[in-house]
Amino acid sequence: MFRPKSRQPSEDDLEVFLPEAKRAQLESGWPGVFRREILPMLWEAEADFSDLYHSVIGSPNKPVAELLGILILKEFHDYTDEQALEAVAFNLQWQYGLQLGFSQAYVCQKTLHNFRGRMVKSQKHQRLFHHLTGQIIDRFGL
């Protein structure tokens, strides 16, 4: 079942627990760039994926932006699904980049697999790729 999500800070966000020096290091590296530049684009695309879910039946969806972010970072790092899900659960860089609190830093492998399957079947991944590529080119003047 699709329920639109918005990124609300949680009580266990990394900003609350990380020392300033570590937070600054994350912010200046790829996690900060991903969080500032890419993740907002994914949140904007959230509603475009509502038709991948049943309107009434099923558990509420994991945020689409989160799943898309995991799939993008998985390819960026050339990880398997298993490695990517482990990074979500235990890697501060991934958690910071995806803006996940400690309690949010878990995705079931079946959830990721099923989402990717529905996305590919609907060909939304192609439209998203072209949309994001255009936004990135505009944003960074490439």
Regions found by a protein language model. Give the residues of each.
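Charged, often Cys/His-bearing segments associated with DNA-binding zinc-finger transcription factors
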Residues: M1-L42
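Basic, short loop/linker segments at the boundary and entry of helix-turn-helix/winged-helix-like folds
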Residues: E27-G69, F76-H77
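Catalytic micro-motifs at enzyme active sites that drive phosphoryl/nucleotidyl and oxygen chemistry
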Residues: S59, G97-Q104
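A general alpha-helix detector
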Residues: E66-I72, T111-F115
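Alpha-helix boundary/capping segments in eukaryotic regulatory proteins
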Residues: H77-L85
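DNA-recognition alpha helix
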Residues: A84-Y96, I136
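Active-site- or DNA-interface-adjacent structural scaffold in DNA-acting proteins
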Residues: F102-L142
